């Protein structure tokens, strides 16, 4: 179970295209798994989300000012106003609307554990989103994810993954969409004291689009998750973390607050 709340500002301009995204985004997800045997399991993941004008712009303006950081992209936008608009090189303009709350796509899959340090999951994402156009995949998609884990020392655990995905082109941006994707993660968890641990995780995703001339859409995504984990007496975990966008360069996700619970 996880809850993410993010404040996002994107303002990309090229001589032939323009992209503005000013929004606060909510995502809640719940994942369930059931063992089929010692080395296989089924999984199900459901989610809900929302896209809002929000309330955090004033705080973020103060925060950036306190750090001496000037963000002209935020200064050019009115506070707590939603906008999601893409102007493309071919003259088309695509707009997305905000939505208070909607159901997300449903993910089902089967996993295999050949040994304690390796896991493979094959999953299908079903287009069940009830949100406005652009907030769900719109078509079924396939994913293969391989994850490895290793104890580097009694206090340090490493985990990395490589995933391949296929999503058929669809919607108003179909001619610019890529269909094959690669994602990878690499991270460590360091035991601090008692049931407390710190974690950091680097995330990579190949570009989603091509030919838009907009860096936020045509380039790869690279981000860093970091935060704190508290293990419960029953074996579950509470996670509190943040995410920092590293690439593409320029303003992106200002702040992501993430809370997760496993049982």
Where in the sequence are the language-model features?
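Transmembrane beta-barrel architecture of outer-membrane proteins
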Residues: 23-27, 103-107, 139-143, 181-183, ...
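Surface-exposed strand-loop-strand hairpins of Gram-negative outer-membrane beta-barrel proteins
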Residues: 1-27, 94
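Outer-membrane pore/translocation modules
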Residues: 47-179
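Sequence/structural signature of outer-membrane beta-barrel proteins
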Residues: 4-15, 51-53, 117, 125-134, ...
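Transmembrane beta-barrel strands of outer-membrane/channel proteins
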Residues: 1-7, 44-48, 120-126, 160-166, ...
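Repeated loop/turn-to-beta-strand initiation elements of outer-membrane beta-barrel proteins
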Residues: 39-44, 116-120, 154-160, 194-200, ...
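Residues on the lipid-exposed face of transmembrane beta-strands in outer-membrane beta-barrel proteins
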Residues: 28-34, 44, 108-112, 122-124, ...
């Amino acid at each position: 179970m996880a809850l993410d709340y993010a404040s996002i500002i994107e303002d990309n301009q090229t001589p032939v295209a323009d992209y503005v995204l000013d929004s606060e985004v909510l995502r809640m997800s719940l994942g369930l798994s059931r063992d089929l045997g010692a080395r296989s399991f089924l999984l199900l993941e459901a989610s809900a989300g929302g896209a809002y004008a929000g309330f955090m712009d004033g705080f973020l303006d103060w925060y950036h000012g306190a750090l001496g950081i000037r963000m002209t992209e935020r200064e050019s936008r009115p506070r707590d106003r939603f906008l999601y608009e893409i102007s493309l090189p071919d003259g088309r303009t695509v707009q997305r609307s905000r939505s208070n709350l909607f159901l997300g796509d449903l993910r089902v899959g089967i996993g295999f554990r050949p040994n304690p340090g390796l896991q493979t999951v094959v999953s299908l994402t079903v287009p069940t989103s009830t949100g406005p156009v652009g907030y769900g995949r719109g078509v079924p998609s396939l994913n293969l994810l391989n994850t490895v884990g290793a104890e580097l020392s009694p206090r340090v655990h490493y985990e990395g993954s490589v995933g391949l995905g296929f999503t058929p082109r669809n919607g108003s941006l179909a001619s610019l969409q890529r269909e094959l994707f690669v994602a990878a993660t690499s991270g460590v968890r360091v035991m601090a004291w008692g049931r407390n641990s710190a974690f950091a995780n680097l995330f990579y995703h190949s570009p989603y689009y091509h030919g838009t001339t907009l860096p936020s859409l045509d380039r790869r995504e690279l981000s860093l998750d970091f935060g704190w984990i508290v293990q419960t007496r029953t074996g579950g975990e509470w996670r509190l973390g943040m995410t920092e966008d590293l690439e593409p360069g320029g303003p992106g996700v200002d702040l992501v607050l993430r809370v997760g619970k496993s049982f």
